[in-house]
A protein has these predicted regions:
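Carbohydrate-interacting/catalytic domains
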Residues: 1-9, 16-17, 25-27, 44-62, ...
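Short, flexible loop/turn elements at secondary-structure junctions
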Residues: 11-14, 70, 91-94, 120, ...
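Substrate-binding/active-site clefts of carbohydrate-active enzymes
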Residues: 1-5, 13-202, 220-230, 246-247, ...
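Generic recognition of stable, solvent-exposed alpha-helical segments in well-folded globular domains
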Residues: 48-51, 98-102, 190, 214-222, ...
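Active-site-proximal helices and loops of the catalytic beta/alpha 8
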Residues: 108, 122, 127-130, 194-196, ...
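Hydrophobic faces of well-ordered beta-strands that scaffold small-molecule active sites
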Residues: 6-8, 64-66, 114-116, 207, ...
């Protein structure tokens, strides 16, 4: 995927339920579905996505980014997919490996690419690799829970202590997400081989790497190079959630700020632009400090990037408040249209979060589960079916 594409981000459990028979797998730890609980599984699956590929194609989508589909056999919160318990297996509540291959094939037949979400920084605590470690050094802090500081800016901070960097990179994301030690050559090989296997097996077109700066820099650089050496046209985007373009640019391939080190990561996520867009369209452009001037001022700083066209740009995603936040604050259709026009025409690779096109609203202050509400019409007997054009806003 590249700047000629429009990525559409889908959380599979919340998009559409095409096969109710796989909603509950009795032998899995979270064996229930409750659509009234935003933190529970809701039953969306790969079949539901495949059934609605024509809808996506008609929107103009050219690439689909799926939140993790690999097995997440965790006791709770397994719907989001970010605590993998088997790197080689699709979660059975979403479908099978064969069904994923079929989805990719069908997407390709309609001119759409498929981007797979992967997580090398951590796995789920129910992963067999953690429950029966090949050796203690497969996980950081010898498998003992030690919380990360989340301060990944320390990686490039010239004033940071070694301890600050270690606790940020080696610390665990949460207690249920043990931190993999990518410096262990066996761990590195396992992760690299698993990603290449999915490329070969399923024919995916790209990878989005979660929590990219939290993993070991050198191993992740080796991985990016290994993949793109084998597949020169393949793209990887790393989640680089940092609050300035200078910090984000450090992680892009051939960054002058990282030299002589090189991440070999072609595409990074432009979180700072997301913040600027969420402010700019709420302000009047009356002086040199606010409104649309924010965007102009920010884009004039693109010289810090090695390749500004390889930035993933977005208004929101599954971890942030939706741009269409709430009725009191930001539900202004003119603001919304302006922002979407800017998103789709600025430099970089535009990404749209599912439901953007039907004005789905959510505030992160009310919990992450509500950022990931069910798409109306994805379940039988939904009172409104937005996959049907007649039920959408003219």
């Amino acid at each position: 995927f590249n700047s000629g594409d429009v990525l559409y981000l889908i959380m599979p459990d919340r998009f559409a339920n095409g096969n109710p028979s796989n909603d509950v797998v009795p032998e899995m730890l979270e064996a229930k579905v409750d659509r009234n609980d935003p933190f529970a599984r809701h039953g969306g699956d790969l079949a539901g996505i495949e059934n609605n590929l024509d809808y996506l194609s008609n929107l103009g989508v050219t690439a689909i980014w799926l939140n993790p589909i690999q097995e997440n056999d965790m006791k709770e919160g397994s719907y989001h997919g970010y605590a993998i318990t088997d790197y080689y297996q699709v979660d059975r509540r979403l479908g099978s490996n064969e069904e994923f291959c079929k989805l990719v094939e069908q997407a390709h037949s309609k001119g759409m690419k498929v981007v797979m979400d992967m997580i090398f920084n951590h796995c789920g605590s129910e992963n067999y690799l953690f429950k029966d470690m090949p050796s203690k050094d497969w996980f950081n802090f010898k498998g003992n829970y030690t919380q990360t500081s989340y301060k990944t800016a320390s990686v490039q901070d010239i004033h940071a202590s070694d301890y600050e960097r270690k606790i940020a990179v080696d610390g665990w994301f949460t207690e249920s997400m043990p931190d993999l030690n990518q410096r262990n050559r066996h761990v590195a090989r396992y992760l690299i081989q698993s990603s290449i296997w999915w490329i070969e097996y399923a024919g995916i077109n790209g990878i989005r790497q979660d929590t990219h700066p939290y993993a070991d820099f050198d191993m992740m650089s080796e991985w990016c190079k290994a993949v793109t050496d084998e597949y020169p046209d393949f793209n990887i985007v790393g989640e680089t959630w940092l609050n300035s373009n200078v910090l984000v640019s450090f992680w892009q391939k051939d960054s002058r700020l990282a030299a002589p080190r090189n991440s070999n990561l072609r595409t990074v996520m432009d979180f700072p632009l997301m913040e600027q867009m969420n402010k700019a369209f709420d302000e009047e452009t009356t002086d040199w400090n606010g409104g649309l001037y924010r965007l102009y001022d920010y884009l004039t700083q693109d010289l810090v990037y090695a390749d500004p066209m390889n930035l993933l740009v977005f208004l929101d995603n599954h971890d942030t408040s939706r741009f269409y936040l709430n009725e009191e604050a930001t539900q202004n259709i003119d603001r919304y249209k302006q922002a979407l026009v800017f998103l789709l025409t600025t430099r970089g690779i535009p990404q749209i979060y599912y439901g953007t096109e039907i004005l789905m609203a959510a505030d992160k202050a009310n919990g992450d589960g509500l950022l990931r509400c069910d798409f109306p019409g994805g379940w039988k007997n939904d009172p409104r079916n937005c996959f049907n054009e007649a039920n959408r806003t003219p």
